[in-house]
Regions:
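H-loop/switch region of ABC-family ATPase nucleotide-binding domains
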Residues: 221-222
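Catalytic Walker B motif of ABC-type/P-loop ATPase nucleotide-binding domains
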Residues: 186-190
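Conserved ABC ATPase signature
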Residues: 135-136, 161-165
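Conserved catalytic motifs of ABC-family nucleotide-binding domains
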Residues: 182
Length: 277
């Protein structure tokens, strides 16, 4: 397979079992430090929720985790993904899928309304904004795009125009774009943001199935309802710092969350799901 082939995936050695390792990570925006001495390790295949209020540093942490910004160079600082400090970002995306709510406006066909769901997912192989005529699309790519749509229970969207889809349908297309590479780990930023209640529940059930099939999930959110039953580890963030890291039963308490959000939080349970008010 040619080195420029978008299906080509750089091999990860079997002993590189850790997905993410952050050591003494500090990030500054201008003169203000927005991440303070973050130390974090996530195993490959582990399901984790990163929970915190708006403005706590979650978005900056995502940028650091995905090599889109770089921490301050200091003694002991390290950012390793699957055991490596240096990655070609195109290759990294084939092991580590990222789905951010802000990407909805950049979804292929969002502005032109001429791209189908299937073409939008195929374009994910090329990290392209649309399926340009000069891109060489193979039968295998089309098969894997359909497979990704099927995993997202969105095969019915294959022929539908992206510009005519609801927010929930577009979210499924975005996730399918990440899944075409069959990544080992998937990061979702505010996965239920801007979705109505039924669409939230449907998406969360689909994400549960991905977790059960073996895709490691990292959910970054400020909604307690986004924390799937499969997620056993929770990381709390506040003021650019890790405020807690441990089993969900220990951290998802009314006392801890009230302190985290600086407001009274009440927790209820609906079958396996948690919700707050």
């Amino acid at each position: 397979m040619d080195s420029d082939d978008p299906r080509r995936v750089e091999t990860i050695e079997d002993n590189e079992t850790g997905f993410l390792e952050l050591r003494h990570v500090n990030v500054a925006r201008g003169e203000r430090v927005v991440l303070h001495d973050v130390n974090l390790t996530i195993r490959a295949g582990e399901h984790v929720a990163i929970l915190g209020p708006n403005g706590c540093g979650k978005s900056t942490l995502i940028l650091a985790m995905t090599c889109q910004i770089y921490p301050m160079v200091e003694p002991g600082m390290a950012v390793r993904i699957f055991g490596r400090e240096r990655w070609d970002l195109t290759q990294l995306r084939r092991h580590f899928g990222v789905v951010a709510a802000g990407l909805l406006s950049e979804l292929p066909g969002e502005r032109t309304a001429v791209t189908t769901g299937l073409d939008a997912v195929i374009a994910g192989f090329f990290s392209a904004s649309t399926l340009w005529p000069n891109l060489h699309v193979t039968g295998e790519m089309r098969d894997r795009a359909r497979e990704a749509l099927e995993r997202m229970e969105a095969l019915h969207l294959a022929k539908q125009l992206v510009g005519e889809m609801s927010a929930g349908e577009k979210r499924r297309i975005l996730i399918a774009r990440a899944l075409v590479h069959r990544p080992r780990q998937l990061l979702l930023d505010e996965p239920s943001n801007a979705l109505y209640l039924a669409a939230q529940r449907e998406l969360r059930e689909t994400l549960r199935r991905l977790a059960q099939e073996g895709t490691g999930l990292v959910l970054v959110t400020h909604h307690l309802g986004d924390i799937l039953p499969e997620i056993e580890r929770v990381i709390l963030m506040r003021d650019g710092r890790i405020a807690g890291d441990g089993p969900r039963a220990e951290l998802l308490t009314e006392a801890r969350l009230s302190e985290l959000f600086n407001a009274p939080v009440r927790i209820g349970r609906d079958e396996e799901w948690l919700h707050s008010w």
